[in-house]
């Protein structure tokens, strides 16, 4: 005799134990089902018939006994092989229909084929054909809530047939239907049986059971009667045989669909779920959007500030060295740089220009207006050393320096604050301290060189005039030195160091720095500031990630039955994992892109408000990548939880 498709031997199923009472639902069920049979399993509520169906459909495992499918011991099959059986061999028709609420009739029917890796065009054509065959051609786009009970059950039957449905497991298929719809469903099952499908009908209604060719009655977990025929049904040869199913199982369980197609399907399904729950999705996205926007804007502001400061510092020249006496210590007095040192340094071949500087903030008055500004005594090399010319009038001359003339060149901010708008500044007088100085020139605008120091708020006077008329001494505060070659700043620094050690009897009582080093130090400071801003903003992205995890955990709880339905139609654990992980990633991707768009809008607004902003592509890409990684990290736990759900418990959850 041919190998039976299904063979149960002394199957037992018990629940509870350890801390709860042990209840044995099935107590030694033995039966065989051959190709082409239409079997009705009938029994009262609580007799164990639904538990038996779950075991037959590989949704549950027995506590004891042997279950062989097409000659293979089901206990030896792994989770992927069991999923293959649910997907390719079995087709489930449930009393409660068990359709995905967010999917259309077409999408519900296509589901088993998606998990089988069937190309989109092929499965869409087959799903449409099945729905048309069952009288639902005009309802393919309708969601379950838009269908009657009978229509939903026909969608469920079409889904069961999608991958062939060689064995239809129908659990009380007419239980929730009116008599007319119930009769239509039974007529469909009769038709399928005549075509060679194995039909296993679970029911408590003996009238419904009488439609089957074979009736098995169970009571209290035991088979009490079985009207098995001696000969197989006449149409048994039309159905698939055990040997063919076994060969297909051996081949198919190790085959996987194209990962690109599977990923695309998961992302499309994720988008549908997000769109259906738009309001909740928007609330969830807020955390990611704010996080990404904060990171991008903070880094852009930091980068803009850095570039602005670097440009302003570089505007003074990168070949400048600064020399001043070392500060006093407990053992040594403060170092002192004299004008003789200045003259000696000026003789070095590496030095292009040298300038002693005397300066401090002083009260400046003009008419009734008085304010404090930095007043510096410099020589005529000031414009060349600092690349800072006079744009109106002229800079003071060597003659002015030699005669200690009371003339001044003022910055743009001094002009703005002290002189009347529209007036000619050249020739006007400013009272610096108690000494009147005539304005002979206006410096070009420079802005802030670093921090909050505004270079345009300064007044430049001849060094000799500052020493005699304002400060009463000729010892410079520091020396500004322009190297002849900007590529030889280090060599120039070394030459000055050697010269001063010789002049100061070997003492290193001076400090020598260069603008290039200052610019590098400022760059490091600005980078640290940018990193700090980015780290602060990243915290909001982390909070957004936690929000994604929370919503995904809630989604898993809400969609537990959907997960069970997907497993019943052949989804493997990795399919469920990919599905929910795709939703988390989709959330993060949409949130990331929206956050970047928001950041660009905010950046444009800041630019209009004269705040320096510089968007960097690596920062934008990095923020987006972090958002996606956040989705993966925080979405993995909920997705893993969903993938590990028990199919039976998931199906029966509320």
From Swiss-Prot:
GO terms for molecular function: ATP binding; ATP hydrolysis activity; transmembrane transporter activity. GO terms for biological process: response to antibiotic. Its main location: membrane. It is found in: Cell inner membrane. GO terms for cellular component: plasma membrane. Has a basal ATPase activity that is stimulated by PvdR. In vitro, interaction with PVD influences the affinity of PvdT to PvdR. The keyword NAD does not apply. Its EC number is 7.6.2.-. Disruption phenotype: Deletion of pvdRT-opmQ leads to reduced amounts of PVD in the medium and decreased growth under iron limitation. Deletion of both PvdRT-OpmQ and MdtABC-OpmB systems strongly affects growth under iron limitation as well as PVD secretion. Gene3D superfamilies: P-loop containing nucleotide triphosphate hydrolases (3.40.50.300). Belongs to the ABC transporter superfamily. Macrolide exporter (TC 3.A.1.122) family. PANTHER family: MACROLIDE EXPORT ATP-BINDING_PERMEASE PROTEIN MACB, MEMBRANE COMPONENT OF TRANSPORTER-RELATED. This is Pyoverdine export ATP-binding/permease protein PvdT.
